[in-house]
């Protein structure tokens, strides 16, 4: 196991790793311990009482954070005709059809989000091996397969994030930057937490919100009390 750096060791001394903090307090600590020379991303990890081996307990979706993530996303839209024009008008960075398919097959991946109209999925589906492993494949569950391409582009540009349980039932997601005001981080956190509470699977047994940990890119994790949401 790699040895911790001095900065991380010093950061850990600023709080009790065994204490469960209220969200606002935890986020203030994360901001204080974000000492890297770049604007660190603030991330949250929810360990949920779900069993991802069961399809109905595999959580996946998207939510628009009220204050965005602090990252400008490059958006690609697969569409034709009027829908292509709608996507361009909404601010999509790249819009196309078969031409974009060929570009991606040639190795180009200069985008963060891919959106497609349903009629284009026959074409886009051929990119599954390229886009799937990178989390870039358009999917109805995340609102990226839709005829409402204008809304989808605006959401993606305006702070929409996707979430998905991993193999052990943890959801990792960014909720902003360390430079954000604490209150804005707290509101982004609450939006995501409320969404996860709302979509709790009916078949989930026992405690649903098991642990919540928030941290900056290079900082230590601070635990949030799930009962204080």
Swiss-Prot record:
Query: Can you quote a single GO CC term?
Result: large ribosomal subunit
Q: Name one GO molecular function term.
A: rRNA binding
Per its database record, what is this protein's job?
Binds directly to 23S rRNA. The L1 stalk is quite mobile in the ribosome, and is involved in E site tRNA release. Protein L1 is also a translational repressor protein, it controls the translation of the L11 operon by binding to its mRNA.
Q: Which NCBIfam families does this entry report, sorted A to Z?
A: rplA_bact
**What is the recorded name of this protein?**
Large ribosomal subunit protein uL1
Top-rank taxon of the source lineage equals Bacteria
Q: What does the subunit comment say? A: Part of the 50S ribosomal subunit.
Organism (species):
Desulforamulus reducens (strain ATCC BAA-1160 / DSM 100696 / MI-1) (Desulfotomaculum reducens)
Supply the PANTHER family for this chain.
54S RIBOSOMAL PROTEIN L1, MITOCHONDRIAL (PTHR36427), LARGE RIBOSOMAL SUBUNIT PROTEIN UL1M (PTHR36427:SF3)
UniProt keyword list: Repressor, Ribonucleoprotein, Ribosomal protein, RNA-binding, rRNA-binding, Translation regulation, tRNA-binding
From the UniProt annotation, give the residues forming the signal peptide.
none
Q: Which HAMAP family does the record associate with it?
A: Ribosomal_uL1_B
Listed under GO biological process in this entry are: regulation of translation; translation
Say yes or no: keyword Ribonucleoprotein present: yes
